[in-house]
From Swiss-Prot:
Signal peptide: none
Keywords carried by this UniProt record: ATP-binding, Ligase, Nucleotide-binding, Purine biosynthesis
Family under the similarity heading: Belongs to the SAICAR synthetase family.
Gene (name only): purC
Protein name: Phosphoribosylaminoimidazole-succinocarboxamide synthase
Pfam families on file: SAICAR_synt (PF01259)
Superkingdom field: Bacteria
Membrane in keyword set: no
InterPro entries cross-referenced by the UniProt entry: SAICAR_synt/ADE2_N (IPR028923), SAICAR_synth (IPR001636), SAICAR_synthetase_CS (IPR018236)
Pathway connected to this protein: Purine metabolism; IMP biosynthesis via de novo pathway; 5-amino-1-(5-phospho-D-ribosyl)imidazole-4-carboxamide from 5-amino-1-(5-phospho-D-ribosyl)imidazole-4-carboxylate: step 1/2
Organism in which the protein naturally occurs: Desulforapulum autotrophicum (strain ATCC 43914 / DSM 3382 / VKM B-1955 / HRM2) (Desulfobacterium autotrophicum)
Gene Ontology terms: biological process: 'de novo' IMP biosynthetic process
SUPFAM superfamilies for the chain: SAICAR synthase-like
Electron transport in keyword set: no
GO cellular component, as recorded: cytoplasm
Amino acid sequence: MDKAVLETQFPDMNLVRKGKVRDIYDTGEAFLMVTTDRLSAFDVVLPNGIPGKGKVLTKISEFWFKQMAPLVGNHLISTDVADFPDVCQPYAKVLSGRTMLVKKAEPLPVECIVRGYISGSGWKSYQNNGTLCGITLPKGLVESDRLPEPLYTPSTKAEVGDHDINIDFAKTVDLIGRERAEKLRDLSIQIYLKGAQTALKKGIIIADTKFEFGLVDDEVILIDEVMTPDSSRFWPMDTYAPGGAQKSYDKQFVRDWLVSSGWDMKAPGPEIPQDVIAGTVAKYQEVLELITGQK
């Protein structure tokens, strides 16, 4: 197994942001978004990563950016290192396959979450009071049930180490104005529906996902990552059975191990065992092949 890329060190380049998974460099005209193999769970970056994960996320996002282009513009300029500025070329080996040259968008301060099925924190909330993010749901749903229609449940965008906080639609109006809030909601549901339909044909249920949007020349565009195993719950369609937790192609495998380990969900996180890493690598590779046809 290859070694995980946990850090990028390009001393003659301008690092402007280090996120949970991505390192962002300013090249002057554009940003260079390098997707590392770091793994975050429960809003904590874990000490060891998943080898090759950054390449999987980049390929899947590139696939979806192209699929969604008729619905919404995006920030992707190129994933080909040959197109990157000269200052990047000495680092071509590290950058190759895990990097996007992207437009300089101004991120909007909302995580746009769409839920097509009830699972995870949404299921816990429904068990407690019959609601999901303040939205009352029909009685009688079971864990992993498909919702009558996809729900838009936005949250704040937390800094590294902080937790995202669910907010209602009215709060997004306060944050970004009614017109943009409505646009983000409508686009999120449209993108989810198109992506979920595409994935279903390939044997994958996208149970829920999150999108991020930004502004370029005052136009709302899709940024960051799109419907990857890091930002979504992916379930195999052939084993789907409502009434309990589902097998998954995403980092739920790691989340389940973390819960069983007795970790208190506070930083620092525990070291992930090699068998859990190997299993996660296999799941990410499988979903890449199913969705994009690439290896």
